[in-house]
């Protein structure tokens, strides 16, 4: 998988969002982009927590 873990999934959903936006499927692109955004936020929070512990 690309990058492994949450970052890989975020990149995957981002690429899917770009592909769907190009193809004109705005609803699917928006949903993929929101999933990617939340995965990145979760990854950042977990990274900060792991640095503090």
Swiss-Prot record:
The chain crosses the membrane at residues 5-25, 33-53. It is found in: Cell membrane. Keywords: Cell membrane, Membrane, Transmembrane, Transmembrane helix. It comes from the Archaea. One of its GO terms (cellular component) is plasma membrane. It is a multi-pass membrane protein. Coiled coil: none annotated. The keyword Transferase does not apply. Pfam families: DUF1328 (PF07043). Belongs to the UPF0391 family. This is UPF0391 membrane protein Memar_0049. It comes from Methanoculleus marisnigri (strain ATCC 35101 / DSM 1498 / JR1).
């Amino acid at each position: 998988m690309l990058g492994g873990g949450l970052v890989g999934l975020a990149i995957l959903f981002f690429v899917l969002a770009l592909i769907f936006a190009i193809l004109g499927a705005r609803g699917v692109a928006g949903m993929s982009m929101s999933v990617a955004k939340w995965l990145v936020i979760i990854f950042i929070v977990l990274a900060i927590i792991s640095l503090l512990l």
